[in-house]
Amino acid sequence: MSAKEVRFGEDARNKMLKGVNILADAVKVTLGPKGRNVILDKSFGTPTVTKDGVSVAKEIELADKFENMGAQLVKEVASQTNDAAGDGTTTATVLAQAIVVEGLKAVAAGMNPMDLKRGIDKAVAEAVKTLHAISKPCSDSKAIAQVGTISANSDETVGAKIAEAMEKVGKEGVITVEEGQGLEDSLEVVEGMQFDRGYLSPYFINNQQSQQVELENPYILLHDKKIANIRDMLPLLEGVAKSGQPLLIVAEDVEGEALATLVINSMRGIVKVAAVKAPGFGDRRKAMLEDIAILTGGTVISEEVGLTLESVTLDQLGTAKRVTVGKDNTTIIDGSGEKSAIEARVALIRHQIEESSSDYDKEKLQERVAKLAGGVAVIKVGAATEVEMKEKKDRVEDALHATRAAVEEGIVPGGGVALIRAINSIVDLKGDNYDQQVGIDIARRAMEYPLRTIVSNAGSEAAVVLERVKSGKGNDGYDAATGQYVDMVAAGIIDPTKVTRSALQNAASVAGLMITTEAMVSEIPQKEEGHHHDMGGMGGMGGMGMM
């Protein structure tokens, strides 16, 4: 085990504070409509230009281990806020810096760190209540577009595209962001349930122009095992042929004699049929088959529940208005499942999302909700260069998270105004002792900082604007883009309540930990003297890669 360096008290806290300031100062220049860009050097390729706070924070590593600890803790504030609300990372960083700077001053003056933390927590809890009280629901398309616009750094086309996507697939629908081909942003909507499995044989194709299988009002057979023996299916195929309707088979696999017979039947026009593999793997496959069954009003034919292929009747099959099967995708449109059953299934999956701790599982469950509830929209981002494309895609993803947060918890006036209004609720808040009161005052002063930073970045006088906004009421605030005092909500300058709340709570939580730090332990860096010469020899080999 390598030797460790330990620092205590004031010495440790000052080092940590230096790291906090370096990271926060780099991040906070991006805040507001007139926030500046930060250029990030990459070890390969062109540098990245960004106005996204969390992207800047993630790039920062400091050489001094103790300073780096401070920087990493603030980075944690940005990451937590990003994970919870998808935006507000810069606001959270500014708040954390303000609380740490003020808090460490108070500790240096001899205050009790634990009481300071209790005071800060008390003030934040009260402020959060006020944020919820002034929050308004975000239901109409216009408000959604405004939230998207603000989060995408005042890019109105992004806000409009997100609002349009939400309108088409519903607020529960899945909206994904991809890199497009042209210069313009575009929106593609896939209605119904789509899963990423295509036809098992190109001989099923009946629309040569689009190279797809198109089935109108088909029966849908769902089976959780492989189908290799056609004899098991003969009674069912005869029944389907008599009905004159097409058939879609979704099974673990269809192979050998069974697939060959289906292809021949299809080509001769005896039964219009297509076969695809079931989506997903393992338990997820079973769940997705069950989803399709509920959507189409069918039953999954599974030996686990005593059902076999030989005994299947037509009323155990699902039905839909239309099914299209391509090389890689299958889309079921307008399944004839019971609405109440679909809603119950969606509620069940939502409950699983709340219970799940894995981000990957949550994402997959959310996709299943969307496929059952509305559909999938894809926003394709257009840009002239690769660098611009990456930067824009980041912004669109941010804006998308922010709009989801707004739909979830509502909206508050933006531009730092909501926090200024929340200050009023803690003016009369009393701590149990003097040190707690100082903690409450620290939180109160910190809540002014997002507004101060937005105004400073816009090149105006922060103190003057702050006093003017404080003396205002309700939604009155400062539009940094135009330099005017306006009604923030009417002007479309709004933030999701969840973003502001998460930023404040996460900042206070991590800053509280820093204020109450008394010792720091870090490894002493090893001096690697012997290796430099060897590496010099290796350097010559770099030329080999250039040939």
UniProtKB/Swiss-Prot annotation:
EC assignment: the record states 5.6.1.7
What biological-process terms (Gene Ontology) are attached?
Answer: protein refolding
Gene3D superfamilies attached to this UniProt entry: GroEL, GroEL-like equatorial domain, TCP-1-like chaperonin intermediate domain
Its transmembrane ranges are: none
The reply on keyword Protein biosynthesis is no
Alphabetically list the UniProt keywords: ATP-binding, Chaperone, Cytoplasm, Isomerase, Nucleotide-binding
Q: Detail which positions bind ATP.
A: 30-33, 51, 87-91, 415, 479-481, 495
- Which CDD domains would you find in this protein's record? GroEL
Query: Could you tell me where this protein is found in the cell?
Result: Cytoplasm
Q: Name one GO cellular component term.
A: cytoplasm
A GO MF annotation of the entry reads: unfolded protein binding
Subunit structure and binding partners: Forms a cylinder of 14 subunits composed of two heptameric rings stacked back-to-back. Interacts with the co-chaperonin GroES.
Similarity comment: Belongs to the chaperonin (HSP60) family.
Q: What is this protein identified as?
A: Chaperonin GroEL
